[in-house]
Regions:
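Phosphate/nucleotide-binding beta-alpha loop and adjacent structural elements of enzyme active sites
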Residues: 1-280
Length: 280
C-alpha cells in the first residue's frame, strides 16, 4: 500500500505536468500577474520556465531571502541580466529611496517587460542600462530565444534555448561602466547571463579590489559555460584562488561554503555566492 507522502508526490508531479501542458494555451507574450512576498507586483509571461516556477511559488525563494537579508537602505545593487526585472523590483524596494538599482538588459522584449514592471511598482530608484556586460567594451551578438530567460551571447547546449534570431547589442565591461557613471561603491551584484558569467567577472576586477564587503550572486553550469570555452570547475577555482569565499545553495537551499570543487557543480545549474568575508 502506498504511503501518504509518496502518493502526494505522485499527485503533485501529475498536477504540475498538467499545468505545464495547459500553459501552451496562453499567448507566449501575454503577461500574468504575480504578487511577491514584499507586496510588489511582477508581471511576466506564464509560458516560460520562470513563469511556471513563479506560478508554483518555487522561483529562487531562498536566493531572494538572502538578497533581502543582505541589502540595506542605501545599498547599490547591480542586476546583470535583469530580464523582466524580478530581482530588480525586489532589490529596489529593499534599498529604498537612498539606494539605487542598475538593471542591465540588452534584449528588446525583455526591456519592455522590465520597464513595465518598474512602472507598475512606481520605482524611482532604478536605472535601466540597455547593454550586455562582459570582458570587453564594444559590440556583440545576442541569441534571442523564444523564452527570453535563455537569451545568451552564444548558442548554448541548454535544451530550452530555442534561438529565433540574433540581435546586435552594446557590450561593456562593468569597470568601464562604474568609472563612467561615477559610482563610488557597489554592495551586491547578481549575474544571470546564460554562460557568460566568467567573462562578467573578468570585466570588474577594479570593483573587486576596491569593495571589500561586496556580495556577488551568480549561476553557473557546464551546459551553458561550455559554449563560451570554459568549465565551471575552472571558473570556481579561479574565484577561490583569488582569495574570495565561495558558497552555494544546496538541495535544502541552505548556504554552504565551498572549500574544494565538487564535480556535481558542473552537472546542473546551481546558484553561487562569492564574498570577501565569511557569510556563515
Amino acid at each position: 500500500m502506498l504511503n501518504a507522502s509518496y502518493l502526494l508526490a505522485i499527485i503533485c508531479r501529475r498536477f504540475w505536468r498538467y499545468v505545464w501542458k495547459i500553459r501552451c494555451v496562453f499567448p507566449s507574450k501575454s503577461l500574468t500577474t504575480f504578487f511577491l512576498n514584499d507586496g510588489s507586483r511582477f508581471d511576466y509571461p506564464l509560458k516560460t520556465a520562470i513563469g511556471c516556477s513563479l506560478f508554483r511559488g518555487e522561483f529562487e525563494s531562498h536566493e531572494i531571502a538572502f538578497l533581502q537579508e543582505t541589502l540595506k537602505p542605501g545599498s547599490i545593487f547591480l542586476d546583470i541580466g535583469a530580464n523582466g526585472g524580478f530581482y530588480t523590483v525586489i532589490a529596489a524596494k529593499q534599498v529604498g529611496v537612498t539606494g539605487h538599482v542598475y538593471a542591465f538588459e540588452p534584449g528588446h522584449s525583455e526591456l519592455e517587460i522590465l520597464r513595465h514592471n518598474i512602472a507598475i511598482n512606481h520605482l524611482t530608484n532604478v536605472t535601466i542600462v540597455e547593454c550586455a556586460i562582459g570582458n570587453k567594451t564594444g559590440k556583440a551578438q545576442l541569441a534571442i530565444s523564444s523564452d527570453g530567460a535563455m537569451n545568451s551571447l552564444a548558442k548554448t547546449n541548454h535544451p530550452q534555448q530555442c534561438i529565433e534570431y540574433w540581435q546586435s547589442v552594446e557590450i561593456i565591461k562593468l569597470d568601464d561602466f562604474i568609472q563612467k557613471s561615477g559610482i563610488k561603491k557597489v554592495d551586491f551584484i547578481k549575474i544571470d547571463v546564460e554562460g557568460a558569467e566568467k567573462f562578467v567577472f573578468e570585466g570588474f576586477k577594479n570593483i573587486l579590489l576596491s569593495d571589500n564587503e561586496i556580495k556577488i550572486m551568480f549561476e553557473a553550469s557546464d551546459l551553458n559555460a561550455s559554449a563560451f570555452g570554459y568549465s565551471v570547475k575552472e571558473f570556481l577555482e579561479n574565484i577561490l584562488s583569488s582569495g574570495m569565499k565561495l558558497y552555494y545553495f544546496d538541495k535544502t537551499s541552505t548556504l554552504v561554503e565551498i572549500r574544494d570543487y565538487d564535480p556535481k557543480f558542473g552537472k546542473k545549474i546551481y546558484n553561487f555566492v562569492a564574498s570577501k568575508d565569511e557569510l556563515i
